[in-house]
Amino acid sequence: MAEGKKYEIAVKVHTTYLPEQSDEALDRYVFAYTIVLSNTGTVTAQLISRHWVIADGSGGVQEVRGLGVVGEQPLLKPGDTYEYTSGTAISTPVGSMKGSYQMVAEDGLRFDAPIPEFILSVPRILH
């Protein structure tokens, strides 16, 4: 068996613009994102920390690192999923996020689960 399949976490993302928390006059655009993590590998793994790279449409980039997600460090057995919702604010109507989750497998191996880049966009801005 290939090692890549043994340690594998799939990441799916859904975003929502939050107009009620945004203020365009102050260049504040707030988005919620829902993440679904699925352990598609063959070993149990725990999410230890996260690393986000958040970019706005004017070239501004911020990096966020921290332990766990929404105050938790979920343990995912093979076949398990974990879902959470969080949010971010950027200074332009369009931006993007990407990053990785740092995982530790039950055998002690540490590995990264990549978070593919996704777009943050106010509705009707991008076609």
UniProtKB/Swiss-Prot annotation:
It holds the Pfam family DUF525. Gene3D superfamilies: ApaG domain. InterPro entries: ApaG_domain, ApaG_sf, Uncharacterised_ApaG. One of its GO terms (biological process) is error-free translesion synthesis. Residues 3-127 form the ApaG domain. Signal peptide: none annotated. PANTHER family: F-BOX ONLY PROTEIN 3 (PTHR14289), POLYMERASE DELTA-INTERACTING PROTEIN 2 (PTHR14289:SF16). This is Protein ApaG. It comes from Nitrosospira multiformis (strain ATCC 25196 / NCIMB 11849 / C 71). The lineage of its organism: Bacteria, Pseudomonadati, Pseudomonadota, Betaproteobacteria, Nitrosomonadales.
